[in-house]
Amino acid sequence: MPPRKLSRYRAKHDFSRTAEPSGSGKARAASKSRRYVIQKHAARRLHYDLRLEFDGVFKSWAVTKGPSLDPRDKRLAVEVEDHPLDYGGFAGTIPKGEYGGGTVQLWDRGTMSGAWKPQAFEGSYRKVLMRRI
């Protein structure tokens, strides 16, 4: 994976202090089906991390309110740095004082159906529809 894709991610983490994947090892192969991961993250404030596989990384957003089964409910998703694909299996505790310090739980994961293009990630706000297969 080209270093530039994860440069912001790597700059924020001290991998000698955290068990989070650095993304510097052997690159995990992209899947044929686009994966998504939702992680419950009890950091400074409880939130959920939404990660969508695209172009060899997880594009990532922090969602401050929990997921809802009602499609009429709206949730603000704030884009954060891309994460390595290995982060899709991460659960554990990030040490206090480190970026994102707190407990990360794997809340849901699956694959997405339908075609989507790079322009889907341009701009500040996007509506994402996922269906578990």
Show where each model-derived region lies.
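A charge-rich, low-complexity, intrinsically flexible signal that marks solvent-exposed coils, linkers
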Residues: 1-133
